């Protein structure tokens, strides 16, 4: 008859701790398979819940509510472990989760909190880390993943001065940050490796900032913003990377910078009838890069700078007061710019071979100045 060794004798062990006063501390350590650890703390201040598990298929849960200066720390080593931390109606709270292995799942939920922080660290493959913050003030969420086939998600809604940061190093990772109906929110995605995807979505927000930085090959990055006073910064360094920025609202700014070969950049901005002051900038260095800028509204400025060969820049501006300043250096560059409205201006310089400029302006007081140097421009 098969028997478990002493090291895994903690199989199917359930540990539960409940506390309803101040300065409570609960520490749980488990070794084995399919262990379950639970901590429930409510009220008071200075509560601490610390859980450590090593093995396979373990589950750790912490619930803290109606308290201040509370801390939840969960550490798991092994495979197919689950860590869940829930904090509600708390102030000055922090939740930290550390996992090593593969197939692990970490979740942090913070609701109605003030000055909350969530930190998740995962090392391995096929891990999932998710953070949900709702109705929070001055909240922050940081997720760091190392390995491949990992998924990181940060969702912040109805928040003030929220910040989400996702860092991934490896291959075939997916990072997603969603911020909804928030004020002064900020999203940062940093990816290193190959075949990674980054998505930042900021919906109905005011003063939102999105930053995406990717270094490697065949990475895709997309930013979508709706609301007022947006800023999007994207840096893509490597080969065959793609950048997509979509902004809708007023007072938008988009900046995309790419290094390498075969890069693709696209910026789309749309305004309300009374909006304006949008800016779109793309800078590309390398070979076979593309830049596409599409603006609707008023008082917009588009700037594209391309160095290298086979670059293509296409700009479409509609409205009034638009300006475009472009510079192309290299071989086989092409620019197509269309402006509709009044007070539009296009000024550009093309250096190299086989450059082509096609400019169309409709309206009044438009100015187009293009200088081409080289052969067969």
What role is predicted for each listed range?
Residues 1-22:
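Gram-negative bacterial Sec-dependent N-terminal signal peptides
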Residues 23-376:
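Tandem repeat domain/solenoid detector
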